[in-house]
Structure formats: structure tokens, C-alpha cells
Amino acid sequence: MLHPRARTMLLLSLPAVAIGIASSLILIVVMKIASVLQNLLWQRLPGTLGIAQDSPIWIIGVLTLTGIAVGLVIRFSQGHAGPDPACEPLIGAPVPPSALPGLIVALILGLAGGVSLGPEHPIMTVNIALAVAIGARLLPRVNRMEWTILASAGTIGALFGTPVAAALIFSQTLNGSSEVPLWDRLFAPLMAAAAGALTTGLFFHPHFSLPIAHYGQMEMTDILSGAIVAAIAIAAGMVAVWCLPRLHAMMNQMKNPVLVLGIGGFILGILGVIGGPVSLFKGLDEMQQMVANQAFSTSDYFLLAVIKLAALVVAAASGFRGGRIFPAVFVGVALGLMLHEHVPAVPAAITVSCAILGIVLVVTRDGWLSLFMAAVVVPNTTLLPLLCIVMLPAWLLLAGKPMMMVNRPKQQPPHDNV
């Protein structure tokens, strides 16, 4: 017979697996639709019209029209496409289900149109809202927080293709003063994360790792080099942190989301022309292209890092629906490659991984997630001790510093209760 503790853990196992599978399927469907639309906008249409897909007029035109389209969705859809991601953490309160259709449409348009944001925040919002709404009907005795945790764990597993990230994140958020052992509380979330990751793996495998030269043995000087790289990435990220609320306030003085997002899309188009097609979209596929292109110089990597960081700030400040983690990883890769080109004596594995650690730490203020992203992009077990050590001064630098988030005006609710 099972111990009562084991039976308690098993109670939410079936709902956890169902939520994990559903979280992954929602992500897969959204990404597939966005991919089809992206192919139409950036491959078939310009080919049919006889226009180069990387021509300035096409890049500016598509991104401007994308901004206008997203603005129309936010303006006229019920619930106004959910809360503004610039004002929200990755895992937030559930929104009314009525806001979800508009949010999904706005996300798909942004992903396909080349906006420099990832899918993580809107997908998380959708999955949490559905899990809470459906779970409250089927199992009303389970509180909303439990459904929120299961949905967010399933989404994290689906996004990254592994339950490891969820285990790391929730090991700190669930480690309270309760007498219930930590792994008892992690059991159901990890079931959801594993189900989400396995379901994603049936359809495609998220490819984060980069073909970077293997790092052999850690030296004492490497720790200093890594800490300096992380500090440079943090400094770049804090510039974005300073700019975001100010640009957000300036853009939203216009009040009309169609105008705000249209202007935001136009600015993103100009940035895309300067940075080229590799600086567009969420950044995961593009960072693979960036590493594969041997023609890039130090100045090219620097330009890509600056353009992508600026595009991330503009997209978030304008109100596009999307997440900031994936484009931040692109910025980290560009910074790391730039620093390696500038100082070849420092291995690229160190510069890239430590730059990712620093910039993701600025964006998320989550040490485990930052370590995870650095470790999966540059998969090398020799780097893990170095990354853990470099995390310490990086965390000290950010202690008490503002987060990459806009404080919501007090008179505005987080979302429309319609």
C-alpha cells in the first residue's frame, strides 16, 4: 500500500499530465500557424511580387503593417488581448478567458511579422488562464495557485523541451516554510513539465545549443574573464532596463494602440533594415545563422547586439504581445561572439555562456533560469562550475536594481474583466 504522502502526490498527477500535454499542444499549434504565416509574408509574397525579402521597403512595410494589425486586435478584441507584457512577470495572475483569442492572434501576428519578442509570456498567460478556468470547474476544491503552478510548469517544459528548467525555477518558488518536503511539492509540477517536454519532443526538438568550440579545462583566469563578460552583459541589459519604462510612458501618451503599435512597427522596421534579416524575429533560429556566418566581424556582432536589444525595448514598450527571454539570449550570443572576436584568448564558450547568463539575469532576475539558458546554449559540463562562480558577482551587481518591467499605472487594472 502507498503511504498517504504518496497518495496525496498522485491526486494531481493525472491533471498535471493533461495540463502538460495541453500546454505543449497549444504552443505547437501557435508556432505552426505563425511559421506558415511567416513563410507567406517573408518568402512567398515577396517572391510573387518580385521584391527581395531583405529589401528595406519590404522589411519596414511588413513590420509597420504588423504593428497596425496587432494594434487593431488590441483595440477591438474582447479583453484587449490580455495584459501588457511589459508590465507583467513571466508567471502572472490568470486573465479572463475572453481575452485569450485576441492574445493568441496578436502573438501569431507578432511572431510571423518579425517582431523581436518570443512566445513565452503570451503562451504562459494562455495556458494559465485555461488551466485555472477549466480546473476550477472540474476540481473546484483545488485552489487557483495549484492550477497556475501546473500550467506554468507544463509551459516551461514545453518551451525548453525538458523539465529541468521547471525543476530549477520551482525549487526556489515552492521552497517555503511548509513542513511538506520540497520534492513532494515538486512532484505534480514536474509531472506537468515532463509531459509538456515529451509532447513537444514528439513534434519537434527545441534546438538551443550552438556549435561553439569545446572548452577543455577551467583556469583561474577564466573565472575573472567570465565575470568581466557577465558584467559587460549586465551593463548593456541595465541600459535597456533604464530605457524601457521611459519609452513605454512616451509611447503610451498617444493612448491609441493602433497608432502606438504602428509607430513601434515602423521603428522596428528601421532597426531591421540596419541589422538585416538576422536581427528580426524571436532570435533562436537567427542566433544559429549568426554563429554559422563566418563573415561577421567584431563590429558586426556589436551592431547586432545593439540592434536586437533596441528592438527588444521598442517591441516591449510599444505593447507587442511577446516575451523577452529568447531575444535576450540572442543579444547574449552576439555580445559573447563580439568579445571573443575582440579578445581571441578568451574562449568563445566562456564569452557566450557568461554573456547569456548576465543578460538573461537582467531580464528575468532568476538565477536558475539564467544558468539553465547559459548551459543549454553552450552545452559543456566543464563550464558549469565556472558559471556557478560567475553567477555570484553577477547577482551582487544586480542586487536591489530595478527589473526589466514597467510599473503599471495604479488607475489601470492588469486586464479588462470582460
Curated annotation (Swiss-Prot):
Pfam family of the protein (one): Voltage_CLC
Membrane topology: Multi-pass membrane protein
Entry GO terms, CC: plasma membrane
Residue ranges crossing the lipid bilayer per the database entry: 10-30, 54-74, 99-119, 120-140, 149-169, 186-206, 223-243, 258-278, 300-320, 322-342, 343-363, 371-391
Location relative to the cell: Cell membrane
Gene Ontology molecular function: chloride transmembrane transporter activity; monoatomic ion channel activity
Domain of life: Bacteria
Entry keywords, A to Z: Cell membrane, Ion channel, Ion transport, Membrane, Transmembrane, Transmembrane helix, Transport
InterPro entries hit by this protein: Chloride_channel_YfeO (IPR022969), Cl-channel_core (IPR014743), ClC (IPR001807), ClC-type_chloride_channel (IPR050368)
Gene3D superfamilies named in the record: Clc chloride channel
Matches recorded under PANTHER family: CHLORIDE CHANNEL PROTEIN CLC-E, ION-TRANSPORT PROTEIN YFEO-RELATED
Family named by the database record: Belongs to the chloride channel (TC 2.A.49) family.
Protein name stated in the entry: Putative ion-transport protein YfeO
Organism (species): Shigella sonnei (strain Ss046)
Gene name of the record: yfeO
